[in-house]
Swiss-Prot record:
This is Phosphoribosyl-dephospho-CoA transferase. The lineage of its organism: Bacteria, Pseudomonadati, Pseudomonadota, Gammaproteobacteria, Pseudomonadales. It comes from Azotobacter vinelandii (strain DJ / ATCC BAA-1303). The active site is at D139, D141. Keywords: Nucleotidyltransferase, Transferase. Belongs to the MdcG family. It comes from the Bacteria. It is an enzyme of class 2 (transferase).
């Protein structure tokens, strides 16, 4: 395994951050989340030696706080790929029903092409912690790790499948250079938005661009 894959990656959930690592301006709810033993999520930002860029998640989209976690403090790490079996077809919210419906197709795609996929966002957080953060109208956030180029016609075919699910699905293609939305790559746009540790920029080929 390449050394960089041993490091925490964007969307990984990490346990072990203490409240004393929060900055003085951190909101009270962020300290309460950490005191309850809940994880932080790795965010996409330039690395600092020995530190991981993370975000503390509270209730709702308005409760997000950026922070830095010492790498040495990590006690547990859960990657999006470890959460793919958490969907249910009956009796749960729309995002988890959508996950159950989509899982066989993504599993087959990954077996065929040697890829990996995972669950991120609120669905990933809920599956990893048991804390209910999803509602019937929540989105389902996913990632697909694609080290080699994915043809745009294949991206469009996958997007068309996502559009048939019972909730909006936001799938990010994780390339060696960063992340691009499947929805963008499936479009006819000449350039798409690539999100990398150094920031976001428009590129023609998100596989050939080298992240700074």
């Amino acid at each position: 395994m390449h050394e960089t894959r041993l490091l925490p990656q964007p969307h990984d959930l990490l346990w072990g951050m203490s409240t004393d690592r929060l900055d003085a301006a951190a909101p009270t709810w962020a300290a309460e989340v950490l005191a309850a033993g809940r994880p932080v999520v790795v965010r996409r930002a330039p690395a600092r030696d020995g530190w991981i860029a993370v975000g503390v998640r509270g209730h709702g989209r308005e409760q997000r706080h950026a922070a830095w976690m010492p790498r040495a403090a990590i006690r547990r790490r859960v990657q999006p790929e470890q959460l793919t079996g958490g969907g249910e077809r009956e009796g749960v919210c729309a995002p988890l029903r959508a996950l159950a419906l989509l899982q066989p197709q993504l599993d087959a795609l990954c077996r065929q092409r040697g890829l990996a996929w995972g669950v991120t966002g609120g669905a990933g957080y809920q599956l990893a912690t048991g804390v209910t953060v999803l509602g019937e109208h929540s989105d389902l956030d996913l990632l697909l790790r694609v080290p080699r180029p994915l043809e745009r016609r294949q991206a469009l075919a996958l997007l068309e499948r996502l559009e048939q699910l019972p909730c909006r699905v936001d799938l990010q293609l994780e390339t060696p250079a960063g992340a691009v939305a499947l929805r963008d790559w499936a479009s006819p746009a000449a350039r798409v938005l690539l999100k990398a540790g150094s920031g976001a920029r428009l590129v023609g080929d998100p596989w050939r661009e080298v992240a700074a």
